[in-house]
Amino acid sequence: PQRFGAEPNVGQCLARTEKTVVSLTTIAADEAAQRLLWPAEHAQGFSAVIDARSEGEYALDCLPGALNWPSLNNEERILVGTLYKQKGAFEAQKIGAALVAANVSRHIQAHVLGLGKSWKPLVYCWRGGKRSGSLAHVLSQIGFQVTLMEGGYKAFRKALLASLPQRVAPISWRVICGPTGSGKTRLLHALRDVGAQVLDLEGLAHHRSSVLGLIPGQSQPSQKKFDTLIWDALGRFDPQGPVFVESESRKVGNVSIPEALMTAMRASACIRVETATELRVELLMQDYPFFVQDSDFFCTRLQTLVDLRGREVVQAWCEAAQSGRSREVVRQLLEQHYDPGYAQSTQRNYSRFADAQVLQLDDIGASALRRLAQGLLSGLPPSA
């Protein structure tokens, strides 16, 4: 008989409880990247992607759809790094282990207790080291089927850059061209609304591409994040159908379009949108209301044109905007800044622009754009 208060031995515990099957496998980053598109129901799909890096690292970029469960947060990561430099690896790892254990416990309490055994996470950190390894180990000990990505985010980034040209290659692009304010972005969104495949680069970049394209209250993603967003979108397209994209220069604000994509776009069939100047002015007044409503912000953005247009011209535009004549400023921006050289520049950069299908846009309303998009998608002669 067991003495009162004595601890049961391991054998007795196992006899009384269901045996936990520990499943922790590793996977190369390039294979993980391919499997990200597979549904969770797939035998090799993932129920969730868990990023064990700090919130600061996660914000710069992460795997598509990843959740952030930091093993060390920003401050803790700095603390452990400082200890490593000042007192050596052993002292740093003791503190790091305590912090990681506490954080993993919090993540389990917050996110894991309600999950069933079928949950299959992919876990990664910066280089596939202790941060992801610790979290993955505990989750696997619970009984989940855990996959640990070798090499972490660093290896994923390398795999992404290597595979991005392969994702671009099979796609048949349709490039929507037209001067500023012609309705390219509205047409792109209308195409998306009627079921077309669309790559909205300006939407991904949180920028409207032109010198004045900064959107108030929205920060642009990092270059790495922008690349990942594009890479993920490319992987979801059906190469059997066309993908519509707006003509762009190499940079959209502060981020650059990947070279393979830029090259493919510039060699693809073009659609040229033609819109009367007055209609373009009206469209810009509608789509850039923050310039009309905040003349000080408008003037701040106009200062970026001083080197190109001269201080006197920019000052005159600012005075007009501040006196309520924003429409006049918009018209002059089109005529003096955006339009000169547009066709020549586009023809030089987009080799098939001269043979572009021409769309005359006489109505910038949603229903007219929808009809235009439906006609374009169906292959019928589109008309607004």
Walk through the language-model features, giving the residues of each.
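Catalytic cysteine-centered active loop of the rhodanese-like fold, especially the PTP/DSP P-loop
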Residues: 95-150
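Flexible, polar/low-complexity N-terminal or interdomain linker segments that lie immediately upstream
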Residues: 3-5, 9-64, 92, 161-168, ...
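Conserved NTP phosphate-binding and transfer environment spanning the P-loop NTPase/kinase superfamily
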Residues: 263-270, 274-384
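Conserved nucleotide-sensing/catalytic segment adjacent to the nucleotide-binding pocket
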Residues: 196-263
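A short glycine-rich beta-strand->turn/loop micro-motif centered on a GG-aromatic cluster
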Residues: 122, 144-158, 200-205
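Glycine-rich phosphate-binding P-loop
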Residues: 131, 174-192
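A conserved segment at the C-terminal end of the G1
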Residues: 136-138, 186-197
